[in-house]
Amino acid sequence: MSELFRDYSEAAARSGAYDEMFAPGTVARKSYGQVDGALRELSLADVSARAESMARTFLDRGVTFDYAGEERPFPLDIVPRVIPADEWDVLERGVAQRVRALEAFLDDVYGRMAVVADGVVPRALVTTSAHFHRAVHGFEPAGGVRVHVSGIDVVRDAAGTFRVLEDNVRVPSGVSYVLENRRAMAKGLPEAFGQQHIRPVEEYPRRLLSALRKTAPSGVDDPTVVVLTPGVFNSAYFEHTLLAGLMGVELVEGRDLICRGNRVYMRTTAGEQRVDVIYKRIDDEFLDPLQFRSDSMLGCPGLVNAARAGGVTIANAVGNGVADDKLVYSYVPDLIRYYLHEEPVIANVETFRLEEKEAREQVLDRLEELVVKPVDGSGGKGLVIGPDASRDELDALRKRVLADPRGWIAQPVLQLSTVPTLSGDRFGPRHVDLRPFAVNNGDDVWVLPGGLTRVALKEGSLIVNSSQGGGSKDTWVLSDSPQLPAVELPRSSITVREQVSVWPVESNWRDRQSDQQQ
């Protein structure tokens, strides 16, 4: 084995995790044959030079993130995560199934609440969720779709079984890194990339635009779509810019929009133009100061009323956050059975509902063994990994749980699967998760082949979030047949403003938006 992999098998064995590239020992799995062969031919100098080249490219293209106040290129490791076709088939079916169930759940809880009446979930589960918005109860979104875009976080446990870890149907973020990672890795490891059939990811913008246009208000033959961003200070602004550009639509801020007569218009250099579909990248609380936070400068007054009247489609729909609630997550297998009459394709991670007395007592006796998460947390913030926590941290956690049991869940510590990752002068096993992205047009749920593989760059760490020092990998889904290139979309010919304006935003807004969009 290459010197780059010295001591790898020993480190992988110590982790106790399922390794994506190697079976126990040093034999590469069949799906990794081309990657293994390519890496064996490279020296440390070769690998380091390619890694540095990818980082420079990311910096030049603006593929960056803010870490402790410093703008850095988003870390991309040179070893891809490879998923064979048969495993992807399971993931694809499981993600699509979950999206359909969450779509049905959201439509129900903002309507008849049959799921409550039939005793599948308690009413308090819905009404006590921080992101259940009564302001949008009782109306159907234009186009009839609530979950246009989703990111379902999936992990593989020590036995090699895929499990859903989290649902993201509010403002799922990260697909820009999927697109940019593929662009970089096609050049970063061409010896392996060009020797096998890898499912393309470049179709995502076309699929997204098609779904947004299909769910436009009735009677609109040629809908105008915009991407609504909080502005240049937002941590995901690069993604907003990239997607708007790739779809050929306008990127707007709240102050570019006007609501009048339950219609939405954008200010352009040629005058006002009606907007039919808003792909919002703003959390609900900041979307409409007439309905939510009155001090918000990020949205536009009247958007919710316009949506209620059917004058505009907002994607994702306002109120979706209730489905992101981690306590609701624990009921999703039941929701799949209730709405779809199917068994879950991908199981949940075992979850303790701390609002239940018996579960709470059991967890409080085992805090040092479990992962405890706030139900409305994101970006890995607020969770406590028991084995890594100090006695003081566990005592503080105990008090918070007792003060607000509804606000917490607990799960066993999963040894997430590992993939070789460059660390210093060699590759070491590092834990990964996977966020497949799905696009729902109302008739079909399309799952982007692969998704965002996030990697914990610190040895032994289970925290993969970029906001806490994580990185990413390109995700290669293998196919048995050659893949066709994606069709490029036309660019927009409308100019909203001559220049993107930079305007001050309160720091707490920036922080909250950053947290919400991990």
What would you call each of these model-derived segments?
Residues M1-Q518:
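Preference for protein termini
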